Amino acid sequence: MKNFLISLILLLVVCTAQLWGQANTLATVTGHVVDENKEPVPGATVVITNKSTGFSSGTLTSADGEYTIRQIPLGSPYSIEVSFVGYGNQTRSNYTLNQGDVLRVDFQLSESPVVIEEVQVVANSMKKKAANIGASTSVSARDIATMPVNGRNFTSLIDLSPLSDGNNLGGQLQSSTNYTIDGMTAKSAYSTGTSNRGPYSLSMEAIREFEVVTNSYDVTMGRAGGQKGEVMKKIIKLICFVLAVSMIAVIFCGCKGSGVVLATYDGGEVLSTDDDGQRTDDPYSVSQFGVTLSGAIVKDRLHYFIAWDQQYDSRPLEIADINGPEDEDRLGIKKETLDKFLQIARDQYGVSDSPQVGSFGKKRNSTSLMARFDWQLNPTNLLTVREIFNRDMDNHGTDDNSNINLYEVYGSNLSTDNSLLATLRTIVTPYATNELKVQYLYQMDHGFPNELLPSSNIPRAIVENVESAGSLQLGGQRFLPEQFKNHTVQAVNNFYWDTDKVDYTFGADVQVQYLNSLATSEMNGRFYYNGMEAFENNTPYRYAREVPVGDPTVKQTVLNSALYAQGKLGLFKGADLTVGLRGEYTYYFSNPEENPTLKQLMDISTANKVKGFQLQPRIQFSWDINDQHTDILRIGGGIIGSA
């Protein structure tokens, strides 16, 4: 028994140190209603209303006078009204709800009506965030507006987490980081990062709040920690991470009519240096501008929000731009050596007579568009439709890993993604709420060789041991051409049921991905030359190439699904225990091809079905000591990963 307790304590300590994420994109309001004698008032009506959008939701107090309203859209100003037969109505106003807030508002009813027009903001900001203290780092829209965020990329806000080193969290792989927007997947299906390779995948003006959640054990979140690795290797990890971005429905909360914001930024003269800090006379500019529109289409019923961001990036591409002895020292190569390499390349290897080294104009154009509509269908149903479109054209932005690559080596990449999301929030009963989300996500990455080369690419020549320069390269490159297309359909349904003793959550998350991939990395072949003389005599010492078997295009259909249930029990004042179970199932519809030679010689089959199932029990204890929102103890653990 003693060893079991020690093991359990160690497990909980380890689990709380790991990275897990939750995308609680909405807020919760809870409280206690009593009468003048401080006795509970059961059956009192509690209604919360957003005075800016007209959204409203309500519930009834329990036998103990407790009430909870879940899945409330973020924004302000909110008012809360309590009414009961025989007592005057009591109203409290001017509340702001941010991502993951659990706002507690208690009422004491009297015979006379009471209206509190303004709620003072106190210095203790833990009051609403007590449920997330120690679990997340939150950045509000106001913080975002005042922070000098470079490039207006919301993912750079991850650096505000104490667990971030700029590339990962807590020392984990970047591929373990999941990204969600409005609680639905926004992660690239092929690599790390978001679904778009551009400088940003969402206008900064469209972000209500950004949250880095690293220590929570809610069953509604999963499918992280590098889902592809887990499927293939069937590894169970205790490490996951989710970035949740929740977008504002109407960004000008409390304003009448429509709102318009114009944002511009231009960097030019002061930034005119290359990557090594050397001054360049070539045109250099990074211009960003955008517009946001918001307002009511039908007052208190239908509202819209539109955000558009555009970036024009014109920074020169510097390739061995030698204009004097200082450049030779900096680059580690003499101009005569470089000229000789170019002459041989043109005379014997067919390199174009157009410039291959120097300073080249390089342009990158990026567009981000978001539109959102919130429609209060009736007092019990809120429908939200949201569209995000991104396009990034990065010309000559893909190089290879030799020390000096000629201009013809540099390829381009076009990245496009489109996300259409519909959310329906329904009040089933005064004690039950259902939220259904359905998303279609399209992602396309198309990389293609330089305009000086054939579209199918050509082999490359790598000349090594060239003085102190290391290696020089001409021809094609390892990555291009490539093309990745991903169609994702995701449906998530969460049902919240509050009882006198336990708050239940039941849900399902189903995601189907259709992947079409053409990855030609290292398939074009490469010749290695030991020095300039061998290059001139065309005597390579090595040739290497990864040869595809058949069509290199890979088509896959993947099912990722999950069922989960959770109960939250109040133990005593300020303390609660949450216990949940999540089951994840992953299935690849297409089988790998059989290798008959391997099967015959070693009786090893390569045509095995790829699938996996994983049960993930989770538990968390939270104690707000004395219910003062100043001292909070949280212990949790569980299995977290992907099937």
Predicted regions and their residues:
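Residue-level signature of outer-membrane beta-barrel architecture
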Residues: T214, G295-I297, W375-L377, T426, ...
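Transmembrane beta-barrel wall of Gram-negative outer-membrane proteins
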Residues: E230-V231, D282-M393, S415-N434, V438-Y440, ...
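Outer-envelope beta-barrel architecture signal
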Residues: T177, A206, G257, D300-Y304, ...
